[in-house]
């Protein structure tokens, strides 16, 4: 999946990410850009507009929770399937989340990182990071196969 050099680059970069800010924005953007994903978050209250979604405290809190789990995965890049096994089971068996949504969230996360870090998020770093989000999405979808 990743070379030692790529792992070092994404791990060093991830240390700069403010998971509370980036997580809330990434989940919020997912819900705005792909509105059908909102059905999994009906208990979050007002999701009636982009502004409502992006300022919703439950969206922000859950986005942080999602990125906290992602951060754990960043510590276990060689065992993403094992790291995300319980979450894969939860999302498959209990929540019935379409596994395509994991890919969508990963892509939205890359957009948010580019927005937050600008030129520091180079094309090479983006390519390395894209491998990570694909790996995480595949690990989360593992239970579905």
Curated annotation (Swiss-Prot):
Post-translational modification S-nitrosocysteine, affected residues: 92
Highest taxon, organism lineage: Eukaryota
Tissue: Red blood cells.
Amino acids binding heme b: 62, 91
Keywords: Acetylation, Heme, Iron, Metal-binding, Oxygen transport, Phosphoprotein, S-nitrosylation, Transport
Quaternary structure note: Heterotetramer of two alpha chains and two beta chains.
Membership in a protein family: Belongs to the globin family.
InterPro entries: Globin, Globin-like_sf, Globin/Proto, Hemoglobin_b, Hemoglobin_oxygen_transport
Keyword match Acetylation: yes
Residue ranges of domain Globin in the record: 1-145
UniProt protein name: Hemoglobin subunit beta
Biological processes, Gene Ontology terms: hydrogen peroxide catabolic process
Protein species of origin: Bos mutus grunniens
Function: Involved in oxygen transport from the lung to the various peripheral tissues.
Modified residues (Phosphothreonine): 11
SUPFAM superfamilies per the UniProt record, alphabetical: Globin-like
CDD domains given in the database record: Hb-beta-like
Residues found modified as N6-acetyllysine: 58, 81
Signal peptide stretch: none
Modified residues (Phosphoserine): 43
């Amino acid at each position: 999946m990743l070379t030692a050099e790529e792992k070092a680059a994404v791990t060093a970069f991830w240390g700069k990410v403010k998971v509370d800010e980036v997580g809330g924005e990434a989940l919020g953007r997912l819900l705005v850009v792909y509105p059908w994903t909102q059905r999994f978050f009906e208990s979050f209250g007002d999701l009636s507009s982009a502004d409502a979604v992006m300022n919703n405290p439950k969206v922000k809190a859950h986005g942080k929770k999602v990125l906290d789990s992602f951060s754990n995965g960043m510590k276990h890049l060689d065992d993403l399937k094992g790291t995300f096994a319980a979450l894969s089971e939860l999302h498959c068996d209990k929540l019935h989340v379409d596994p395509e949504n994991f890919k969508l969230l990963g892509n939205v996360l890359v957009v948010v990182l580019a927005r937050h870090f600008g030129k520091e998020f180079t094309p090479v770093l983006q390519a390395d990071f894209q491998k990570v989000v694909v790996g995480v999405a595949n690990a989360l979808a593992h239970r579905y196969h």
